[in-house]
């Protein structure tokens, strides 16, 4: 194989942010998960709205607004996840004790 001089070898580059700044997180994947699987009291939907607002603020360049909306989305996602897990545990406990039954056989 012949090496051509008119081609420049490509190497992966990493983009460095400003030193001392933390990346702005919008928690969008977590919000999508909570929207579709653990939408307790519409907390997943609200978290999704705040995640999108955070991403929009990040695109515009409003760092403080993006951090605020991202923090709110994080708090709502935590609440939705905890309430969803508690609901699942309560339902499993009620089903195990026989308080609720999924199917009744009428024979």
UniProtKB/Swiss-Prot annotation:
The chain crosses the membrane at residues 32-52, 78-98. It is a multi-pass membrane protein. Its main location: membrane. GO terms for cellular component: plasma membrane. Keywords: Cell membrane, Lipoprotein, Membrane, Palmitate, Transmembrane, Transmembrane helix. The keyword Transmembrane helix applies. It is found in: Cell membrane. Residues 1-31, 99-107 are extracellular. A lipid is attached at residues 41-42 (S-palmitoyl cysteine). Expressed various cell types in torpedo electric organ and muscle, especially fibroblasts, capillary endothelial cells, and axonal cuff cells. Residues 53-77 are cytoplasmic. The keyword Transmembrane helix applies. It comes from the Eukaryota. It holds the Pfam family CD225. Belongs to the CD225/Dispanin family. This is Dispanin subfamily A member 2b. It comes from Torpedo marmorata (Marbled electric ray).
